[in-house]
Structure formats: C-alpha cells, structure tokens
UniProtKB/Swiss-Prot annotation:
One of its GO terms (biological process) is transcription initiation at RNA polymerase II promoter. Disulfide bonds: none annotated. Residues 8-90 form the HTH TFE/IIEalpha-type domain. Monomer. Interaction with RNA polymerase subunits RpoF and RpoE is necessary for Tfe stimulatory transcription activity. Able to interact with Tbp and RNA polymerase in the absence of DNA promoter. Interacts both with the preinitiation and elongation complexes. Belongs to the TFE family. GO terms for molecular function: DNA binding. It holds the Pfam family TFIIE_alpha. This is Transcription factor E. The gene is tfe.
C-alpha cells in the first residue's frame, strides 16, 4: 500500500493521531521521499523543532521511522537523517488490535467476576469488598451504596471482543 493510500485511510489517520498527537500530526501526515533532517521538516512545516523531534521519536519508537547519524567533520555536530517506514503501519495496527483484544478480555473477566456498588450521588463505583469496608456508605459524600448491574457493559464488551476476534481471525479462547 502506497503512502498516499495509507494516509487517506481514516483508521490510519486516527492511529497516527493517537501516536503523535495534534502537534505531531503534520509531521506524520507529510512523510517526505527519502531522508530528511528534523530541521528541514520543522522549516518546511512551520513547526517548532522540539515538536518535530517529539513526533519523529514517537514514530521511531513505533517502528514507523528510522534514522542514521552523520557527524560533521568540521564542527563535530551530529545530524540525524530520518526516513519514514509507513509500510509497517498495517503490522503495527494488527499488534495494537491484539493488545486491545487482550485488554478487553481481561476487563470483561474483571467485570463479570466482581460485584459492584455505586453511589447515586457522586457516581463513585466500588467492588463488594470496598463497599463492605465502608459499611455500604460512600466515603466521599456519605450517600448509600447501591448494588450495580453491569450486564450491559459486559455485553457491549463481548460484542467488541467478538468483532475484534472476527477481524483478527482469532478463535474464541476456551476457559
């Protein structure tokens, strides 16, 4: 998939935005052909050098950019030449989806295996043991803690888990 195709995909745009944030998005959205210095990018995009460097290092940490160093023989200064590697984005997205699936499965298990109590006044939620320690009285406002049904939350998580499993072609884990 070409850079242009990748960058026109809303899922990939969101992924890049989540990685580098709004200040780094111009860097992520404008990958140059070949090598470029951080100074050249900052000047070309009209951004602060620190914002460009922050975005480049985030892309580097996520295997979406690489660099090589050159030392100026006269001054001894190092110059970093950056190359974007967006061909890794689909693989990175798949890994992210696997992490999300695992987190959702763990959270669903936690939600299913625990009983929760909610303060109707300040909306704080407590596990049964905590609620019992507080005598079923909210430690913040003194309101009564009521048993909370979380079936809708668990069902929504199960739907998301199933959709992710389908997308990733992952079989249902047997407990």
């Amino acid at each position: 998939m070409a850079f242009e195709d990748l960058l026109n995909d809303p899922v990939i745009q969101k992924y890049l935005h989540e990685l580098v944030g709004p200040t780094g998005m111009p860097v992520a959205a404008a990958p140059p052909d070949g090598e470029v210095t951080d100074e050249e990018l900052a000047e070309e995009l009209g951004l602060e050098l620190n914002d460009v460097r922050r975005a480049l290092f985030i892309l580097y940490e996520n295997d979406l950019a690489s660099y090589r160093r050159l030392r100026d023989e006269d001054s001894g200064w190092l110059t970093y030449l950056w190359t974007f590697q967006y061909e890794n984005i689909p693989e990175q997205l798949e890994e992210e989806m696997h992490r999300l699936l695992e987190a959702l499965e763990n959270r669903r298990q936690y939600e299913s295996e625990n009983e929760f109590y909610l303060c109707g006044e300040c909306q704080l939620r407590f596990e049964f043991d905590e609620a019992m320690e507080f005598g079923f009285e909210c430690p913040e406002c003194g309101g009564r803690l009521e048993s909370m049904e979380n079936d809708r939350l668990v069902n929504a998580m199960e739907q998301h888990i199933e959709a992710l499993r389908d997308e990733l072609h992952v079989e249902t884990a047997e407990a």
